[in-house]
Amino acid sequence: MGSHPTPGLQRTTSAGYRLPPTRPPASVSPAARGGPMASRGLAGGCQAPQALKAQRVAQGAACDGVQQDQLWRELLEAERRGQQRWIQNWSFLKDYDPMGNKKEPEKLPDHVPLFSDTVPSSTNQVVGSRLDTPLGQTLIRMDFFFTEGARKKKLEDQMQPI
């Protein structure tokens, strides 16, 4: 037996109450037990979205919508600052190819028509634009004959109601 606790079993008092473990089990990560690499809180002490649900419940109302909004604004501002830094430091690279030769800018046409002659301008025309072709006419004819049995038919005179 000895004085060393058995791994996997919790300590209890003589009255049957469970005592907290003297050290956390090895299966618990350092971040979860609050070690040196514990997750840092974000703006206003609010945890990151991937934080454990238990931590969010323990924090209570500290992680409300206002703090989430503030966090979002800070993240957007950091993104904008990163874009500005890239423009200042690295934007010259977009004017050169991988071999270091200066790229020629593409010449744009003087006039671009608003509507295309070959591509329909709406979804309905996409369906209807190909029905005037010989293949479209053949498909219409085949569809008409294949669905003939499913169509409503006029009853014969003797089957008509009086």
Curated annotation (Swiss-Prot):
It comes from the Eukaryota. This is Ciliary microtubule inner protein 5. Keywords: Cell projection. The keyword Transit peptide does not apply. Pfam families: LLC1. The lineage of its organism: Eukaryota, Metazoa, Chordata, Craniata, Vertebrata. The keyword Protease does not apply. Residues 1-44 are annotated as: Disordered. It is found in: Cell projection, Cilium. GO terms for cellular component: cilium. The gene is CIMIP5.
